[in-house]
């Protein structure tokens, strides 16, 4: 069959699902990094203010991921709909899942701005390395710097242990390092696994304002983007918040979850903190996982895993606040700097206790999938103004109300 006749397309490159017979054993390699910095009591108040404390608690242990299982799910991911296409229908990871699994806030300002040209593109911006010195008190040696990134090892060596009698300002410096590493490893890891990008400097400059951002929607935007990239048959590495993806699978697909993990707390992803998958026979396990997905029926998927009394008993109430809950069913944009994705929950209404109607056609955002911030820095709230406006109007786009004004 000629490439032009392939059913699975992604920006001109065929979807891996269309090549299973030719390449039956592509197992994605998970690109991940552990933050691995102790959480000091004096840093915790800043994390609570930033709404990142629950994520920091997840950071205390390394989360292993089953690469063969994730690879089988990627084969069923459709970039057009941001859903997994299963034998029983569509399902996906939503903002509700992010809240329960990672304990992140959903409502808030988008995580956006520019990447490096702070002095040129933002009000009160500073040259990147000048700002870095102001925030961290020093510059890393040139051997630890590559363009606008710094080696993880430098932060580990310099800021891993807070001095016993640190001043308040020293605590703030170490807090910036902790949060920078936390965001770069747990939520927004990319394929450059050994380096930290300077895009976070404007956020770290104002620790007291970090709580006003929608970390949950940004994390989901980045996971969607990484999954969409992963469907490209030529891609072999997968980054992003993979502990979210794997925990979502285990919570919603009981036949695929490991045994012996019945106890759980909050955030719900902590349930699998001690899970260690097999690391051998990856191709064979991929085939087994693929067959398991082929045999799934509607009763094999837990549509509402968070409605149980056991879950209600451990949930922290702040994630259930109205301003966050209302967005779980919003059909809206998801923003993480240059990565813009679409929250298409109108296709998975049973995950919210609803009855699935025939959904509208998928929103064509193929051109957005070609944008990743390379090719020149920009002020993304202006460059992607339409999509930022959609997030600004997010409360008007809940499927519990009218969808007519959400998408033209």
For each predicted feature, which ranges?
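Structural stabilizers in ordered domains
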Residues: 1-408
């Amino acid at each position: 069959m000629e490439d032009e006749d392939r059913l699975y397309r992604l920006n001109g490159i065929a979807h891996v699902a269309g090549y299973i017979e030719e390449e039956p054993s592509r197992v994605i390699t998970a690109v991940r990094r552990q933050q691995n910095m102790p959480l000091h009591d004096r840093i915790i108040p800043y994390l609570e203010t930033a709404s990142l404390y629950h994520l920091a608690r997840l950071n205390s242990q390394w989360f292993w991921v089953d690469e063969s299982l994730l690879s089988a799910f990627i084969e069923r991911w459709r970039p057009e709909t941001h859903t997994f296409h299963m034998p029983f229908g569509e399902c996906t990871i939503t903002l509700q899942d992010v809240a329960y699994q990672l304990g992140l806030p959903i409502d808030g300002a988008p995580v956006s701005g520019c990447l490096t040209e702070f002095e040129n593109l933002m009000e009160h911006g500073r040259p990147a390395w000048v700002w870095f010195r102001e925030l961290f008190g020093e510059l890393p040696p040139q051997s630890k710097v590559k363009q606008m990134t710094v080696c993880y090892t430098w932060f580990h060596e310099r800021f891993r242990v807070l001095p016993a009698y640190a001043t308040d300002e020293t605590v703030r410096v170490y807090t910036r390092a902790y949060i920078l590493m936390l965001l770069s490893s747990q939520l927004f890891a990319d394929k450059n696994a050994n380096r930290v990008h300077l895009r976070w400097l404007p956020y770290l400059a104002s620790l007291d304002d970090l709580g006003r951002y929608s970390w949950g929607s940004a994390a989901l935007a980045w996971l969607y983007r990484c999954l969409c990239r992963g469907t490209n048959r030529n891609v072999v590495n997968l980054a992003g918040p993979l502990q979210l993806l794997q925990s979502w699978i285990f919570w919603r697909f009981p036949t695929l979850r490991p045994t012996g993990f019945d106890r759980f707390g909050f955030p719900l992803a902590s349930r699998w903190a001690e899970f260690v998958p097999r690391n051998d026979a990856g191709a064979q396990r991929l085939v087994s996982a693929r067959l398991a997905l082929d045999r799934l029926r509607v009763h094999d998927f837990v549509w509402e895993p968070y409605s149980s009394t056991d879950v209600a008993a451990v949930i922290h109430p702040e994630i259930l606040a109205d301003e966050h809950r209302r967005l779980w069913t919003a059909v809206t944009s998801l923003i993480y700097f240059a990565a813009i994705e679409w929250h298409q929950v109108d296709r998975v209404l049973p995950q919210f206790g609803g009855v699935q109607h025939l959904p509208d056609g998928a929103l064509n955002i193929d051109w957005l999938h070609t944008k990743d911030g390379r090719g020149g820095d920009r002020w993304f709230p202006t460059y992607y103004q339409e999509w930022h406006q959609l997030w600004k109007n997010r409360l008007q786009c809940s499927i519990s109300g009218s969808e007519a004004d959400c998408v033209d």
